[in-house]
Amino acid sequence: MMGHRPVLVLSQNTKRESGRKVQSGNINAAKTIADIIRTCLGPKSMMKMLLDPMGGIVMTNDGNAILREIQVQHPAAKSMIEISRTQDEEVGDGTTSVIILAGEMLSVAEHFLEQQMHPTVVISAYRMALDDMVSTLKKISTPVDVNNRDMMLNIINSSITTKVISRWSSLACNIALDAVKTVQFEENGRKEIDIKKYARVEKIPGGIIEDSCVLRGVMINKDVTHPRMRRYIKNPRIVLLDSSLEYKKGESQTDIEITREEDFTRILQMEEEYIQQLCEDIIQLKPDVVITEKGISDLAQHYLMRANVTAIRRVRKTDNNRIARACGARIVSRPEELREDDVGTGAGLLEIKKIGDEYFTFITDCKDPKACTILLRGASKEILSEVERNLQDAMQVCRNVLLDPQLVPGGGASEMAVAHALTEKSKAMTGVEQWPYRAVAQALEVIPRTLIQNCGASTIRLLTSLRAKHTQENCETWGVNGETGTLVDMKELGIWEPLAVKLQTYKTAVETAVLLLRIDDIVSGHKKKGDDQNRQTGAPDAGQE
C-alpha cells in the first residue's frame, strides 16, 4: 500500500482544474457575459440599470460601460470584459458586438471539443478564417469622401441610432462632426485627431438637450478673481501662465532671523516689490486677460485690476492647454520671459456667464480653434452621463472615418456577406479543419440574428431569407433593418459603419476565442486564513468557488 500514496506537488491550499472541465467552464463564462450584453445591440436595444458599490446609479446600453461596473470572479469572464475595454480605447465603438461575437465563436467551438477534436486544430481553422474575413471585408468596403457633410452625418447617425441619444440624432451628429473637424490637426501630411485631450465635454444639469452646442473655443468653470474686473471683453489679448503670481517662499522654507524692526519692514517691502515687478512684466504686453494654473495673491489682483486686466486663477492644466490651442497663445512659466508672440489674439470674445449657481468663463468665436468644448444641457445627471457616452462614441466613429475613409454596410449585412464568403470557401477545403472553419461563418450570423431578436421578429424565417439573398449576385449590402425587423438594402437605408471598427471587432473577437481555447489548466491559490477572517463580510474568495 505504501507505494501507492498520492504525491502532493502543489501546495494544499491551491485548487487545480484541468482538461475538458476548464475549457467548458471558460466557454460558459464567455457565453454568460455575451448573454448579459446581447439585448444591448441595435436600435431596439434595452437599457441596463446598474448600482455601483457607492450607491450611484448607472443607466446605459453601452457594452463597455455595463461591463466596467460588473464584478466577476471567473478569470475567463475577466478577459472578456478586458476586450470590450480594448475595443473602446482603440476605436471607440463596437464594444457590444465584439463581446457577442467572441462569446459565439467560443460557443460553436464547444461542439468540436466534445467530439475530442484537438483545440489546436480549431485554433488554426479560426486563424485561417480570420485572414479570409479581413480580406472579404476589404473587398466589400467602399471609399467615402470625408468632405461630403451629408454622407458623414449619415455615417455618424448609423452609430447613434442604437443609443439613447437617437431622439436628438441630427443635433448629436452635427455636434460630433463639428467637434471632430475642429480638433483635426494636420502636420507634415500626418493627421492627428485627439478627442480626449482637446474636445472636452462639459455637463451642466438644467435646460433641455436641444440647448447643447459646440463652442468654437473653450469653457471653464471659473470666475474672475476680483469682483471689479471686466467680465465681457471683445477680441481679448490672452496671456497664459503656469506659475503663481504670489511671493516665492524659499524653496526649503528657510528661517530668517531678524534683529531690527526695519529688517522686517524691508522684507515685507521686498515681497511687495517682487509681486509688483511680476505684474509689471505682464502689464507691459497690455493683455486683457491673464489665466494661470496657480494662485494669484491679493496684491497682484490689485495691480492687475488697476491696469484693467481680468485675471482667472487655478485653471486645470488640461484646460490651459485647450485655451492655448484655441486662441493661439503659448503657456509661459516665467512672467519676465513673456514676449509679444506668446500673447493669444485668436479669440473673438471672453465672457463670464452665470449658469445655475456657478460662474463659467467662455472664450469663444476663435478664428482657427484647434480645441473645442461641447456644452451639454439636460434634465438629470444620469441622462447627461449617458448622452456624453453616446457622443464620445459618435466622435470616435467620425474620427475613424476621417483617419481611414473606408465604409462597410451596417445592420448585419457585412457579417452575412463575410459568412457567405467563408461558407463558399469551406466547400473547397479538405481535412478536419473545414468544420471549425465553417463554424466561424455560423458564428458571424449571431449579429443579424440578435438584431432580429431584439426587435421581436421571427428569427428563423428572416435569417433563412437573408442567407438566400446573399447567395445572389451584388446583394452583399442586404441586412436587417433594426427598427422594423425587415430585410432591406443598407445602401438605400444609408446605414454604414467604418471599416476600422469592423476589422478591430473581428480581430479582437477571434483572438480572444483563440486565447481562451488555448487554456487547459487553471490553478487558483487560496487566500491565507487570516485574510479569510477579514473578508468574511465581503464576497467569497476566488479560491473557494
Swiss-Prot record:
Entry GO MF terms: ATP binding; ATP hydrolysis activity; ATP-dependent protein folding chaperone; protein folding chaperone; unfolded protein binding
Swiss-Prot/TrEMBL GO biological process terms: binding of sperm to zona pellucida; chaperone mediated protein folding independent of cofactor; chaperone-mediated protein folding; positive regulation of telomere maintenance via telomerase; protein folding; protein stabilization
Location in chain, cross-link Glycyl lysine isopeptide (Lys-Gly) (interchain with G-Cter in SUMO2): 15, 248-249, 381
Modified residues (N6-acetyllysine): 222
Keywords carried by this UniProt record: Acetylation, ATP-binding, Chaperone, Cytoplasm, Disulfide bond, Hydrolase, Isopeptide bond, Magnesium, Metal-binding, Nucleotide-binding, Phosphoprotein, Ubl conjugation
Keyword Nucleotide-binding assigned: yes
Enzyme Commission code(s) on record: 3.6.1.-
Any Pfam family matching the protein: Cpn60_TCP1
Annotated positions of the Phosphotyrosine modification: 247
Disulfide bonds, paired cysteine numbers: 366-372
Residues involved in ADP binding: 42, 94-97, 162-163, 411, 482-483, 497, 502
Organism superkingdom: Eukaryota
Residues modified to N-acetylmethionine: 1
Binding site for ATP: 42, 94-96, 411, 482, 497
Catalytic activity: ATP + H2O = ADP + phosphate + H(+)
Annotated localization: Cytoplasm
SUPFAM superfamilies for the chain: GroEL apical domain-like (SSF52029), GroEL equatorial domain-like (SSF48592), GroEL-intermediate domain like (SSF54849)
Residues recorded with modification Phosphoserine: 11, 170, 243-244, 252
Subunit structure as annotated in this protein's UniProt entry: Component of the chaperonin-containing T-complex (TRiC), a hexadecamer composed of two identical back-to-back stacked rings enclosing a protein folding chamber. Each ring is made up of eight different subunits: TCP1/CCT1, CCT2, CCT3, CCT4, CCT5, CCT6A/CCT6, CCT7, CCT8. Interacts with PACRG. Interacts with DNAAF4. Interacts with DLEC1.
Protein name per its UniProtKB record: T-complex protein 1 subunit gamma
Native organism: Rattus norvegicus (Rat)
Gene behind this protein: Cct3
